[in-house]
């Protein structure tokens, strides 16, 4: 499957997110609902984005005791989320119970992606962890695969190594910035073309699209770059 673009609807009002989503109809396949938008709008935003024709990635990065995360996965699946994130550092029991919870939805089970090392971390910045973020991401990816997760969230810099060592595991890469774009608060960034060449399956882009004069055109340009990189 060719790499797909996910637009992060990281906006402060539900109405703004829906206006942007309508502008992006037919231009992108996926939208991301993150903590800010979900806290503002609740599960109804997932249904409303489905009604506009989008696949929905719910990026809540679940991290709690196994039972709580399993129940949250069920709630997200019932709301229609098709891809969810949870922290690999929650451990085997948490991730395994999340897998069981997701699978209880049969053909409508959401994909589960484990968060490895946030792309805002640079070397030596992860609290209590001395490993380089890229090495730490690779270690957690191996665990995620053994725990039954569908993929991991990692920077494009880790994608090639993860793909080589964890056969069948998908990579979802935030921190994607077109050449010349502001890095904002991201550190381990990569261009769309390089991320695709590294093996990314999903590319998450927010501000370079949200802040563009024409978000739909910005999304089309990024997808053209992704397609040309194959």
Regions found by a protein language model. Give the residues of each.
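N-terminal glycine-rich anion-binding loop in soluble enzyme alpha/beta folds
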Residues: 1-23, 27
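Conserved anion-binding
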Residues: 2-3, 64, 68-151, 155-160, ...
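Generic structural signal for hydrophobic
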Residues: 23-24, 49, 76, 144, ...
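Structural motif
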Residues: 26, 52, 79, 147, ...
């Amino acid at each position: 499957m060719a790499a797909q673009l996910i637009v992060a609807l990281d906006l402060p009002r539900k109405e703004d997110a829906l206006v942007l989503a309508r502008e992006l109809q037919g231009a992108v396949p996926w939208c991301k609902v993150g903590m800010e938008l979900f806290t503002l709008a609740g599960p109804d935003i997932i249904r409303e984005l489905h009604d506009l024709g989008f696949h929905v990635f719910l990026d809540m990065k679940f991290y709690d005791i196994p039972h709580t995360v399993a129940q949250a996965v069920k709630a997200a699946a019932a709301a229609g989320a098709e891809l969810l994130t949870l922290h690999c550092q929650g451990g085997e029991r948490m991730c395994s119970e999340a897998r069981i919870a997701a699978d209880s939805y049969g053909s409508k089970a959401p994909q589960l992606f484990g968060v490895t090392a946030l792309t805002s971390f640079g070397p030596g910045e992860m609290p209590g962890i001395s490993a380089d973020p890229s090495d730490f991401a690779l270690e957690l990816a191996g665990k995620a695969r053994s725990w039954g997760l569908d993929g991991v969230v990692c920077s494009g810099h880790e994608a090639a190594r993860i793909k080589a060592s964890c056969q069948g595991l998908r990579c979802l890469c935030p921190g994607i910035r077109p050449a010349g774009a502001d890095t904002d608060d991201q550190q381990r960034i990569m261009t769309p073309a390089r991320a695709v060449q590294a093996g990314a399956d999903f590319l998450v882009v927010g501000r370079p699209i949200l802040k563009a004069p024409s978000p739909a055109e910005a999304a089309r340009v990024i997808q053209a770059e992704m397609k040309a990189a194959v």
